[in-house]
């Protein structure tokens, strides 16, 4: 069995992750052999665009006390079997076993710090757990030949923490599928009236994503529906908020869909939203992939006026940024876009510029 050129290790299902999917497609276009280790509902191995994806059953990792140690052990065992030439650790949890493996075998290691993992929203009010993950990152980040970040603000933050790391920026941009996707009739699928405007949120349903705030705004917007595409622990809370605000008839859910299908939903809405609340440093620095996915799909955007997001919509003139808890600002932004939506839709040349394939070509140079 020959060693793969690249192995991507990811604490999640890579088929539902745009960054993993886009990396796979980019590497396969270069005729590189690619294998991916992820976490899913079952133990299974299958092909995706010529790459082999191996999923670990998440039921094996359901103990809060032991799941990460089991994950570390499984990853190191697989890496030893596969002996890849280059490893991309797609999160902090994957960096640890990959760095430990590198101590035993010569291999190129790239740490994809797509978020500030030691400052995640889930670590707010959990200082001991936060210190543990910070210790792990500090211990192993220098094992990486390169660290890659999603935005300049993250690059600066990490460079201040770890001055000697070699860090590059590769933004969370959509693949070309978002440019050429077939449009799903979401109104027909969800029985939404043709005259109803659709606000779209796609992504994980976690605290601090601004969904409850948007639900509060909905009752002031007239004939408007919010379609949420994704899964997560906050779903029940959103349903309760909708009931409390008397907008249950305006809230629609679609379960998570594979990344390759996501563009079809983006094409079918009227406005895309990502009102991230600054409840952690990771959220303060956020430059979410959905922001670019909306823009490339032709959707005007309403987003938080956090540094990276505000800069993005200002540069590309694809939407309006607002204070993330300002109800009147959201309503005004919605009305402004609704009256002049073409002013906030970027042209085809700019859409092409914002594709992963066109902006992240240098990633191949890190691999070779």
Describe each model-derived feature in a short phrase.
Residues 339-367:
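A charged, aromatic-enriched C-terminal amphipathic alpha-helix characteristic of glycosyltransferases
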Residues 66-70, 108, 117-140, 156, ...:
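Nucleotide-sugar donor phosphate/pyrophosphate-binding loop at the beta->alpha transition
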Residues 7-9, 148, 193-218, 227:
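Conserved donor-binding/catalytic core segment of Leloir-type glycosyltransferases
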Residues 25, 72-80, 96, 100-104, ...:
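Membrane-proximal helix-turn-helix segments that form the acceptor-binding/catalytic region
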Residues 38, 130, 134-181, 192, ...:
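Donor nucleotide-sugar binding/catalytic pocket of nucleotide-sugar-dependent glycosyltransferases
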Residues 271-274, 293-303:
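Short hydrophobic beta-strand element within catalytic cores of glycosyltransferases
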Residues 315-316, 320-327, 334-341:
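Conserved acidic donor-binding segment of nucleotide-sugar-dependent glycosyltransferases
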Residues 229, 236-264:
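Nucleotide-activated donor-binding/catalytic signature segment of Leloir-type glycosyltransferases, i.e.
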